[in-house]
């Protein structure tokens, strides 16, 4: 799943797995096998201190797990509720912790193609918070994860990772998993000291994410006045 040759990884291995899940080409038993193997291999933890080639396994494992959760959540899917409660919870926990230790900032690599660990980790968070079996009482934990990501990343996102992280918020709002009142309250609690250059980079990432939330909800005519004002006030 993390083959270093992007033509093989993107054009053959991953696309085959993703298509088989999304288009329900696997039998239920084959889907079960993929789930068991994904959990057993713990790809999100693979050489987590390393960047470069090792990141490919972590990053594309995140995309695979996102596809598995998406299929498990869809009522019209052959694999609807195919995950056991234990498997589902394991995927939730692994996905929520992944971007709290990932350190590879690479977007596109001339050597490996798209690495995009933070974008893929964000895609996994979207599937977690939007999954109907993810406890609604835990959505605040996902917001806390986002806050921790913004406060630990000491570089400026340049490959739309901040926009992918925005999907975690606006997709949860559009799917009625997260109230805009809760998002607004979370925004007012955020504190960026803005005392050095790293602080400004972190604030800039968060602000870019929130602007994307604003634009996407406004486009859907779903942006509340409360959240509109909270985002507008999120400035230096």
Give the residues covered by each predicted segment.
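Generic structural signal of hydrophobic/aromatic residues within well-ordered alpha-helices
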Residues: 34, 38, 95, 146, ...
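Eukaryote-skewed repeat-based solenoidal scaffolds used as protein-protein interaction platforms
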Residues: 30, 34-175
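Intrinsically disordered, serine/threonine- and proline-rich low-complexity regions
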Residues: 14-18, 52, 236
């Amino acid at each position: 799943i993390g083959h270093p040759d992007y033509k093989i990884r993107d054009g053959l291995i991953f696309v085959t797995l993703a298509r088989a899940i999304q288009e329900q080409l696997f039998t239920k038993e084959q889907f079960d096998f993929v789930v068991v193997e994904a959990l057993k291999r713990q790809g999100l933890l693979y050489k987590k201190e390393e960047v470069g080639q090792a990141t490919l396994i972590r990053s594309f494992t995140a995309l695979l797990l996102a596809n598995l959760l998406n299929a498990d959540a869809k009522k019209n899917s052959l694999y609807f509720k195919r995950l056991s409660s234990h498997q589902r919870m394991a995927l939730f926990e692994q996905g929520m912790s992944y971007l709290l230790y990932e350190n590879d900032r690479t977007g596109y690599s001339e050597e490996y193609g798209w690495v995009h660990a933070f974008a893929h980790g964000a895609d996994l968070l979207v599937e977690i918070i939007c999954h109907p079996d993810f406890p609604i009482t835990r959505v605040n934990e996902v917001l806390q994860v986002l806050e921790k990501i913004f406060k630990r990343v000491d570089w400026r996102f340049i490959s739309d990772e901040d926009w992918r992280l925005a999907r975690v918020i606006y997709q949860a709002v559009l799917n009625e998993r997260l109230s805009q009142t809760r998002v607004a309250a979370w925004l007012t609690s955020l504190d960026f000291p803005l005392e050095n250059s790293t602080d400004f980079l972190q604030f800039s990432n968060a602000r870019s994410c929130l602007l994307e939330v604003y634009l996407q909800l406004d486009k859907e005519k779903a942006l509340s006045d409360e959240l509109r004002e909270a985002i507008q006030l999120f400035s230096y």
